[in-house]
Structures are given as C-alpha cells and as structure tokens.
C-alpha cells in the first residue's frame, strides 16, 4: 500500500497531498450543525419559559408564591371583609380559590415540561458536545496524517519506518472518521424521540388549559345563577331608557294621546308593563312584487303596506298586511327587506298620493289640446307612469292609478332565508 502511495505521490504536485473527507460526510456534518443550533435556541427559550411560569413574588404573608396564587389570596382575604350575602364577595372568593388551583396546575405543568422536554434537550446538547470533541480529534489526526504525507513526498528514498508511521496515521484517521460519522447519525436519529417528547409537551399544555378552563367555567356558571332576577331587571331598564330617549313617530302621536288619557282614568300609577305598549310600530311599503316560495313567506304586491312585528335578520322581516287606517288584514308572514321601504305616516303617504294624481291631471290640462273630460283617469304606459311619479318623489305604483295596462313586476335577488 505504501509503495503504491509513493508511486502516486511521485505523479502529484505538493499541494494535493491532503486527506479529503467524503461529500456525504460533509453534508451530514452541515445538517447536524443546523439541528444543534436550533435545539440550542429551543433549550434557552424553554428555560426562560419554565422560569417565568415558576417565578414567585412576595405575597401578603411575606411568603414567596406565584403571581396567580398571590392574586387568589388577596381576593379571598378581601371577600371575607364583605357581607356574607354579597354576590360580589361570593364570586370574588370563588375566583380567588380558582386562582390558587390554577397556580397548582401551573407548577405541575412547569415540572412536567422540565422533566420531559427540557432535560431531553439538555441530553441532546451533551451528545452534541461529545460529537464536537470527537470532531476535534478527527481534525488532529487528519493533520498528522497530512504532515506525514508531506514528509514522505519530500523524501527521495523509501523509508520503512516512515511507511509504518503513515500506515498507522491513516488507520487512526479512518477510525476517527468512522466514529464521528456514527455520532452524527445518532444525533440525526434522535428526531423520532424529539417528536415523541414534543407530543407529550403538547398534551401537558393542553391538559393545563383544559383544567384551568373547567375551573373558570364552573365559577362563571355559578355566578350566572346567583342573581338572574337582577340581570333581567337591569336589561329591562336599559331597554326602557333607550325607548324613552328615542323620538316618537308622528303617526303614533294620536294613539299615544288616547292611551295616555285612558291611563289617567285608572287609579293605578304608570308602571313598567304599560311602557312596553309605547314600543315603536314600524310600517313598510312594498316597492316590488314578491311571490312567497312557501307557506311562511308573505306574498307582496307593489304598494302593499305591512306592519313589521319582528326583524328576523338583516335581510328578512316578519309582519302583517294593513290598510291605510293601520287595520290588520289577516295576511302575515316573512318577506325580504330589500323589497320594501319604510314609511312613517300612513295619512301623509295617502295625501301625497292624492296630490300626485291632482298634479298629473293639472299638467294634462295644460299640455293637451284635446277637448275631453280632464277628470278622467290618466292612461299611460307603466314605464311612463313610474317615471312621472318618481319625479314627484312619490312611491306610487301603477296600481294606484287607473291605467289600462298591468303594473310592472320587478324582482330583486332574494336574500338567504334566516335560520328560524
């Protein structure tokens, strides 16, 4: 082997007498370096996280405890100073005890994270440190081997002792190369264990948050069951205040006056249930025809007036048809919002329609030379009729005018049916 080496070195220049590592070895070494750097950062971040979980503060009793435990103790102590029947004091005491339990679970989480994950990262970094020691040893043997190669290249005569040294140096270099390679493969194969430890950490964190959420949900449910009547009264007061603060529609002023007069006859004072009768009544007018797709939907014709009883969502109303005197006609159901427009006074709306007809007849008298009865209905096409009335800012349709043609049916895209 040595003789073959000398025959090879006699043909090569001096600069090529070096021991080269395989490309696969160098690629594996680069991958291990990336893994080691990432796990080193994970170890530092995990250490900071666990330390923050276990960080203790000075409590009221001058004892070290977790921040949430200190908060729980303060809540419990303050709740004892409040009356025993105080809902606030009861809830404060329950939340304080909950924080103490959460502190116990928090300590358990930190302990499990340290044992299952942090210690595992620490063991990996120890193995990586041993790998670096073996890598330094390999580099030292490589340099020794290359030094002997350089020396043998300069020698003009064959030296058996030098050949033996080269053979021994090559053996040590190959041995160290194999050892370092095995260590790198072992560090790479740890990925399966890393995945298992990471999964356990996820389970520990998930259990912690589940237990904490369960504790808080128990308190929340008990807190809701303490004073349900007070919450109902509070919500009723807020609704009443909002109603009283809103202006009243002119169409309901007469109705309100009659209601007030009848209430003055009664000897009982004005109570909260009577205020609910003041709820604003909403009227809308159909500006498009709509055919219901099932029994629950209300058929609409252009010009129909509907009293809205409930809004099922942003796109649907529930209501009943009424006449010009706000008398219910018995047809009720749900209908789309975008097929209607809101009106505020049925009487004003009716007078607007009358004035629009009179104005149309007056213009007919002015612009026409045909000697005919100008009080007869104006006969126009539906499109002309609608355009003319739109200029008068009126919501009249062709149904309100005695025309020879049928009203135009206009459809708009139907919204989605609400889940009710």
Swiss-Prot record:
The BAR domain, residue ranges: 10-232
Gene Ontology annotations for the cellular component aspect, listed alphabetically = cell division site; cytosol; nucleus
Highest taxon of the source? Eukaryota
CDD domains per the record? Answer: BAR_MUG137_fungi, SH3
Q: Which GO terms describe its biological process?
A: endocytosis; meiotic cell cycle
- List the subcellular locations: Cytoplasm; Nucleus
Supply the InterPro entries for this chain. AH/BAR_dom_sf (IPR027267), BAR_dom (IPR004148), SH3-like_dom_sf (IPR036028), SH3_domain (IPR001452), STAM (IPR050670)
Where does the SH3 domain start and stop, copy by copy?
A: 279-345
Which residue intervals make up region (Disordered)?
398-420
- Single GO MF annotation: lipid binding
Cytoplasm in keyword set: yes
Annotated disulfide bonds: none
Listed A to Z, the keywords are: Cytoplasm, Meiosis, Nucleus, SH3 domain
Q: What does this protein do?
A: Has a role in meiosis and sporulation.
Q: Under which name does UniProt file this protein?
A: Meiotically up-regulated gene 137 protein
